[in-house]
Amino acid sequence: MADCSDCPATSLKVFGQPLIVRNIQTAKEFLDIDKVVVPKESTNAVKLIEENFPYIDVEQFSSSNNNNNNDSRTITTTAFHNYLLNSNEVRTLNKKAEFEVPVNTFIHYSLERAALLIDAVIYPWDFLKLIQKVLCDNIKDTIISPNASIAKSSIIEGPCIIEDGVTIDDFCKIKGPTYIGKGSFIGMSSLIRNCMLGEKTRIGFNCEIARSYFAGHDKMAHQNVILDSVIGKGVWLGGYSGTANVLLNNQNIRYELNGQLVDTGINHFGAVIGNNCSVGASVIILPGRQVPSNSIIQAGTIFGKKKVIS
């Protein structure tokens, strides 16, 4: 995945934090860090690091010529395969000059394996898998903000984090592990299962959302079904729309990438909807489809191999 100013490390959020910020915060719990070196293309990453870690120096390098030699405790964002570091290896790293990770990566600690895990985020389904893992690993109890409003008729089942300003209407069911970001609204009779919903996500009446990620500031009308999908920021979904997530033959879902169909390795995968898209009423998005940012899909469309967008 190429480095860019709006890469997943800066555009995606985990528990309300940009991915790159959460990565550094996690690494800092185990490593002494006083400098972070990022590719020149990742301009947003520099801004985020400076805002959140003013005491950490930030440098940039040309990704075509990465020769950083210094004596500081450094995170250098380069590229390699996924791996884990056990406690002994973490102690060893603290004595080294540099610690290199891909810019589009996810760093998290596994209590079960007693290791710092570093997973590259290459494909959308990689991110969905990691979101499910981080929900399970990080949400062990239900934490509800005193500033949240939950109807007495609604059910919170399993561990959930419900942030400030969240409103959950009557007869809803929230099944954990689930995270609901600040200022979000869940409409009457909706079912939310194993999801991460960014801030100011608005879910309408009688919707089902399962194993999905919403970037935030998204709005859904009534009776929608979103399954195993990644929804970008500022998306509008009209009523009676949804993402199909399984093929009738139950084979692995294939995803179009650069004109080629890539086997996802999984048989449950919905759609990837880019930022600021508008999806009309009664639209069905077939499994493994990508809706580019700023697209408009007219009402009644079946969004499949022959894409119909404006």
Question: How should these model regions be labeled?
Answer:
Residues 1-147, 289, 294, 300, ...:
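Terminal amphipathic alpha-helical/low-complexity segments used for targeting or macromolecular assembly
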